[in-house]
Design a protein with these regions (language model features):
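Acidic di-acidic motifs
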Residues: 24-26, 198, 224-225
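Non-catalytic pre-domain segments flanking phosphatase-related domains
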Residues: 1-23, 39-46, 69-71, 267-268
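Structural motif
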Residues: 20, 52, 219-221
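Short loop/turn segments at strand-loop or loop-helix junctions that form parts
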Residues: 21-26, 85-88, 141, 148-152
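Active-site phosphate-binding/coordination module
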Residues: 35-134
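Acidic, Mg2+-coordinating phosphoryl-transfer loop and its flanking beta/alpha structural elements
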Residues: 147, 206, 212, 216-258
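Conserved acidic, metal-coordinating active-site core of Asp-based
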Residues: 130-221
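Asp-based phosphoryl-transfer active-site loop
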Residues: 14-34, 55, 83, 206, ...
Length: 268
């Protein structure tokens, strides 16, 4: 699978062939748990005027709403936006008045309990159960359980400094995988590990969306910051989407500027 940096793209070719542009949220469109900044809002809404856009995030709908949906401009073309939180295990569309749920795949109570127990036990054993946290460490997102070592609302600077080489998260991933071989366990953001049913990841989101739209997977571009084979954006590429790597929202702003400069027709 080929993943290209945003700065290496042939933008003319991309704009000619892509029928939908998908985006990760945290550290792609916005800083973790923070709303999109005005420059991003302006460009994201402008992109909706030109093409179909998908938002595929590991976060739950509440976070997606606060970071993106609540800050869209009043005239944004919400009908062009496909919202797929928790890695596509939920799917929402705008019905003219609100974001309506199309489908949801939620974990059973027994599975939630088993995953939560494994995450806490191994985090403690590995010395990752930090004393200073900002919010809950373990969050049930319905179709995904997420462990956040510093809590759900930790400052971005603290999260960035916690596991710069990803060894802490990967150690927890491997330990939980051994307990729950039937589940998919992946490193998420700076401090997080996501656990979901096998097959319910961003590859699933890409397959569901491209089937819904009646397009090929390679007619979808997916932009994210976690594009290594162990990252939670990489499954989108494994499903056939064109992978584009950014390092932060500032890169994404420049990517959007380049895309918007090449669009000169109304939404398809």
């Amino acid at each position: 699978m080929v993943v290209r940096s945003w700065s290496e793209l042939d933008f003319d070719n991309v704009c000619s062939n892509a029928k939908v542009f998908g985006f990760d949220l945290d550290n792609t469109l916005a800083s973790s748990k923070q709303p999109m900044k005005p420059a991003m809002i302006e460009r994201f809404c402008a992109l909706l005027d030109h093409t179909v856009v998908a938002l595929i995030s590991g976060g739950g709908m509440a976070v997606v709403t606060s970071q993106v949906l609540d800050v869209l401009t009043p005239n944004a073309r919400r009908g062009n936006l496909h919202v797929m939180p928790t890695s596509g295990s939920r799917y929402y569309r705008w019905d003219g008045t609100q974001w309506a749920l199309v489908y949801a795949h939620d974990l059973s109570e027994a599975t939630v309990a088993a995953v939560s127990e494994s995450l806490e036990r191994h985090a403690r054993e590995l010395g990752l159960w930090e004393q200073q946290v900002w919010g809950p460490r373990i969050e049930n997102r319905g179709s995904q359980i997420t462990f956040s070592a510093l809590g759900q609302f930790a400052p971005v600077a603290a999260k960035q400094a916690w596991d710069r080489d990803n060894t802490k998260k990967q150690a927890l991933v491997e330990a939980v995988k051994a307990d729950l071989p039937h589940m998919r366990v992946r490193a998420g953001g700076y401090t997080s590990v996501d656990v979901s049913e096998r097959g319910i990841d961003k590859a699933y989101a890409v397959r569901k969306l491209t089937q819904t739209l009646g397009i090929r997977a390679d007619e979808m571009v997916f932009v994210g910051d976690r594009m290594t084979p162990t990252g939670n954006d990489y499954p989108a590429v494994e499903a056939g989407a064109i992978g584009v790597r950014v390092e932060n929202p500032q890169d994404t702003v420049q990517l959007l500027d380049a895309l918007l400069a090449r669009f000169d027709t109304p939404a398809r």
